[in-house]
Amino acid sequence: MKPQKSLRARAMDILSRQELSRIGLKRKLAPHAESEEELENVLNEFAERNWQSDLRYAEAYIRSKSRKHGSLRLKQALAQQGIDEETSRNLLPDRSSEKLAAIAVLRKKFKHPAADLKEKQKQARFLAYRGFDADTVQTALKHAWDDGWEEDC
């Protein structure tokens, strides 16, 4: 039988594989902690030593998801992980990058422009579900199949 790992060793193993927010790390460690105080001590130590950083987690998350998702969805996901709104707002891509991402996502999913209103609504719902705001959705639907669409954003 394997000996039980200490909470500190578990945290180190988890963070060596992936960046996590404080809340995410707490969720993973909670079942193994003997007390809330022990868990908080480990979390505080890791934060002080900069082994766990909410800012680093937010940067990595946005970098990996911003090509497929809009700022609304990214903000919501970061808020669920305990990242404050100001931090997430500062890290989110600018409006033109978001519009280019929406156009790229739209062109990848739908190979041709909408033929009728029903198809256009389907495309708009798809982008809205991905977290793009109404202005970005309208811009993407308008310019996605135009030549030189990059300059219009």
Curated annotation (Swiss-Prot):
- The answer to whether keyword Cytoplasm applies is yes
- The record's principal subcellular location, in a coarse class, is cytoplasm
What keywords is this UniProt entry annotated with? Cytoplasm
What Gene3D superfamilies does the database record attribute to this sequence? Answer: Winged helix-like DNA-binding domain superfamily/Winged helix DNA-binding domain
- What's one GO-annotated cellular component? cytoplasm
Quote any Pfam family the record assigns.
RecX_HTH3
**Gene Ontology annotations of biological process type:** regulation of DNA repair
Q: Specify the domain of life of the species encoding this protein.
A: Bacteria
- Keyword flag Cytoplasm: yes
Q: Which family does it belong to?
A: Belongs to the RecX family.
The record's section on NCBIfam families has: PRK00117.2-5 (NF001055)
Q: State the protein's name.
A: Regulatory protein RecX
Gene behind this protein: recX
